[in-house]
Amino acid sequence: MVVALGLDFGTSGARAIACDFDSDRSVSVSVTFPKTSQNWPQVWREALWQLLTQIPADWRSRIERIAIDGTSGTVLLCDREGQPQTEPLLYNQACPIDLADLADWVPADHAALSSTSSLAKLWFWQQQFGALPPDWQILAQADWLSLQLHGCSQQSDYHNALKLGYSPDRERFSKNLLDSELGALLPVVHEPGVAIGPILPAIAQEFGLSPDCQICAGTTDSIAAFLASGAHQPGEAVTSLGSTIVLKLLSQVAVSDRLTGVYSHKLGGYWLTGGASNCGGATLRQFFPDTELESLSCQIDPTKKSGLDYYPLPSRGERFPIADPDRLPQLEPRPENPVQFLQGLLEGLTQVETLGYQRLQDLGATPLKRIWTAGGGAKNAVWQQLRQQAIGVPIAIAPNTEAAFGTARLAAFGLAAFHSAGLKRT
């Protein structure tokens, strides 16, 4: 029986799920990060060792493949042995650079043309240091953690490498970037799930793991959550109804739109495209605690319209499906009846999701066929009915949404379920 281990490193903690896919059995453990740290690599490494220690010994000894997912855009510089030479720059840290400086290295619509991208952070470090030693390397969070297990320098996957300037359709970095002073620091890029190498003997012995256990190329946390859902057909999508609304659609065609933050990740023979609105559960919680949301939702008749026309932003600014940094919340008029008010908010959020999928299809993505729902809002049956009425495709709660489970699935099976005849790009 093959056991695969998926490790998910998020912003507030880490989780590990070991899965025996032959018997549908699994074991899960987790750790929480401190809110702040002066040494994030040490926090991550200690969390990695804690997770391995917490997995029962009889499970550990049967693990044959391991993969790690991490936060997209969180990167650090280290030497070839993996010793950090800088503090990491986190996913949401913008770098004060001129994006025009990156224009010769990536296409005009590339996801790396952002002040928070990994490439922007590498260029920022180059400006800060004056010159970077050619025997250093830039690694994403997941890459660096994998290095602790396999010991192979400069290894990444094409999901984490996208924001570093990697072009998945061409399967390479541009010649201009490779020939630049940054080229020596770039990683070798693998398909997610491909084995990079065996676990280091000392690590295997310390934690009671098989010396034949393979460490595989990883992915990002958001893609791992998509993999956990089981969606694998073009036209299938996952909507995450959390503090914000995040859409991910499996498409036969890659689409992009820098204005609204839409870009596409290669996923085997398909593309995973999507966008994220600022609207979501954060707006609902401004007005209702969770218990009240549940009780009021039960009183809504979804077959009758509220008559309200809201755009429920939590504060100024929207990014997708409408790019408008000055857009204000539209939450008036507010009726005295809280049931009607909540219905108006849910209808507004539903409209945002509807417009989002329409925007992806306007850009040329594969038509939407089915939605799997993740996040706290997935449990709201009335909201689901409103969404199904508006969007017009089957909607169901995703059977699994744990990123660590998706990464365990990636370690076990790679991207075999996503390979098709060919890739297209608009």
Swiss-Prot record:
Pfam families: FGGY_C. Its cofactor is a divalent metal cation. CDD domains: ASKHA_NBD_FGGY_SePSK_AtXK1-like (cd07783). Changing D221A: Reduced ATP hydrolysis in the presence of D-ribulose. The lineage of its organism: Bacteria, Bacillati, Cyanobacteriota, Cyanophyceae, Synechococcales. Belongs to the FGGY kinase family. This is D-ribulose kinase. One of its GO terms (molecular function) is D-ribulokinase activity. The gene is PSK. Exhibits ATP hydrolysis without substrate. Phosphorylates D-ribulose. SUPFAM superfamilies: Actin-like ATPase domain (SSF53067).
